[in-house]
Amino acid sequence: MHYLRYFAIAFLLLLSSCSVTRHKPLIEGSTTTIPNTPSSNFINGSIFQQDNSLYYGYQPLFEDRRPKNIGDILTVLLQENVSASKSSSSNASRKSNANLEMNALPKIINKIIGNDQLSTDINSNNGFNGKGGSSAANTFSGTITVTVIDILTNGNLKVIGEKKISINQGTESIRFYGIVNPKTIDHNNQVMSNLISDSKIEYIGDGYINEVQKMNWLQRLFLNYFPF
């Protein structure tokens, strides 16, 4: 009897552990980087020095201050508005009639049915009508500052960043990843998110408000395995 009680407790603990839904992050890895320390090259007295020299990270006097090195930052203006809709309908119908009539019957059959003729009518009617539709709309706006983590061979910048906001007992986290063309960065060191290639935007939160929005393990059990 005691073993059955211990087994029931262990079974409930196992189910409670299965109730925790593991969230797989869309953007993995570190969301920041530290630029490499430039090597000390020989200074030849020229105005223009080689890359990765002691003047690494300098900003030209007569040019816009745009990110061009690993570790530089820029601001991304999040303006995402995606909407989609789909509708479909189909119908089919089929109708058939069959008539069988026999005027001359054998005597044996005539004695059974008591009639000199046999007639049969068969009617069939089949119809189908189906309609379906779906729609989705997503809007995301805000700002996030990202860091350049790599420079591609064509000059495009690979950026990544994260912003965390803690309010009372909950924490909201925004992560962003994408590839930026430096030509799309304006004079305020900002770029629109719809101009960034291969962008990934992740907005997640934790806390009791986020927990109440999740389905518990018993509800998921009925949802996945209940046949009705």
UniProtKB/Swiss-Prot annotation:
It is found in: Cell membrane; Bacterial flagellum basal body. Keywords: Bacterial flagellum, Cell membrane, Lipoprotein, Membrane, Palmitate, Signal. Residues 1-17 form the signal peptide. GO terms for cellular component: bacterial-type flagellum basal body, distal rod, L ring; cell outer membrane; plasma membrane. GO terms for biological process: bacterial-type flagellum-dependent cell motility. A lipid is attached at C18 (N-palmitoyl cysteine). GO terms for molecular function: cytoskeletal motor activity. InterPro entries: Flag_Lring. It holds the Pfam family FlgH. PROSITE patterns: PROKAR_LIPOPROTEIN. It is a lipid-anchor. A lipid is attached at C18 (S-diacylglycerol cysteine). Its main location: membrane. Belongs to the FlgH family. Assembles around the rod to form the L-ring and probably protects the motor/basal body from shearing forces during rotation. The basal body constitutes a major portion of the flagellar organelle and consists of four rings (L,P,S, and M) mounted on a central rod. This is Flagellar L-ring protein.
